[in-house]
Amino acid sequence: MINGKLKSQVDKLWEEFWTGGITNPLTVIEQISFLMFARLLDLNESRNEKMAQKANTTFKPIFGKDKQHLRWSNFKNLDADSMLKVLRDQVFPFFKTDPASSEAAIFGNFMADAQLMIQKPSLLVSAVNMIDNLPLTEGDTKGDLYEYLLSKLTTAGINGQFRTPRHIIRLMVEMLEPRPNESVADPACGTAGFLVETMQYLQRKYTSREGIFVDDDGTKHYSGDLLEAYRDHIQKAMFRGFDFDVTMLRIAAMNMMLHGVEKPEIRYQDTLSNSFMDKYPELSANAFDVVLANPPFTGSLDAGDVHASLIGKVKTKKTELLFVSLILRLLKQGGRSATIVPDGVLFGSSKAHLALRRMLH
C-alpha cells in the first residue's frame, strides 16, 4: 500500500498529462510505462555495473559505449527540446530493437508499433522529473504504485474491457488457492490483475514469520522466502496471459515485471480465434491448473474466426458463452476456474445457454 505522499505524486503526474493535452487514460498509463521502463533499464544497468566492478567480472551491457546517451541518467539532464528529440528519435527506436538484457527484450516485444505521444517538450521534462522521484528501486512499493496508477482505469474500453476491482480479484484468487507448482492463465488478461494478484497471494502464503517485515506505517511486506524451490517455475512457466489489445499487453507486461515476475509470458492473441490453436497448440487445451478471467462481453465478434471446438459446443455469437467454453477447454483434468460472467449465463434460456450449463454440470 502506498502512502498519501506517493499518491499525491502520481495524481500530479496524471494531471500533468491531462493539462498537456493527453487525456485518454490508457494512453497516459502507456506513456508513463514507457518512461518508467526507460528508468528501470538504467537502474538495472547501474546495478549490474556495480556488481561487476565489485566482483571483478564482466557482464553484457544493455547500453554499449555508443549508446550511453540513451540512458535515463543522461538524457534526463538535457534541455527540453533536446530531450524530446533524443527520446523520440533514438530511445524509442532502441526499445524496438532486441537489446542484450532479458528485460529490454521482453518489453521490446510489445513496442513494434509504439509511439511517443508526448509532443510538448515541457510536458516531457515534467514527466521525466516526476518519474525520476518515484521510488522504483523499492520492491513492493513500485508494484503498489503501478496498481494505484491502474486504478484510474475506471471506464470500459471499445472492446468491453474494464478493470476488475482489486477486492474482487483478491477474493477470486483466494477461493482457488493456487499453488506454486501450478500453471495459471488469463485468456483475456487486460492489465494482468489476476496474474499479479496470484503472485501476491503466493508471496503472502509462502512467507515464514522471519520473512515478514513491517514498515513505519504498519504495512506488512512478504518476502516469499518459502518459494525458493519454485522460483524458476514461477519466473518462466507459471503465468500465461493473452489479449488482443497491444496497449493492454504493454501495461500487463509492465505490471507483472513491477510485481516481481521478471519474464512475463504475455502474448498478443485472440483466444477465441482459430489461430490460437495453431500458434500455441500446447497452451490452447488441457494446459492449465487454474484459469482466472473477466472476459469482455461486448464488442464485435467475427463468428467465422471462432474455433470450431467452441462453436461446435455452444452455437452462438455471445462472447460470454464462448469464453466459458474456452476456459473449460483450457483447464487440465481437475483444474479450477473463477470467471466473472453476466447473470444471463446461469439463467438464459437459449439453446446455447442450456448447452453450456450442461457442460458445466
Residue map of PLM features:
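Non-catalytic, mostly N-terminal accessory regions of nucleic-acid modification and defense proteins
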Residues: 1-180, 253, 265-274
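A generic secondary-structure signal for well-formed alpha-helical elements
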Residues: 39-45, 153, 192, 202, ...
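Conserved S-adenosyl-L-methionine
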Residues: 161-290, 298-300, 317, 321, ...
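Short glycine/proline- and charge-enriched loop/turn segments
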Residues: 231, 304-312
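A short, conserved alpha-helix within the catalytic core of class I
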Residues: 303, 323-324
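Short glycine-dipeptide loop
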Residues: 331-337
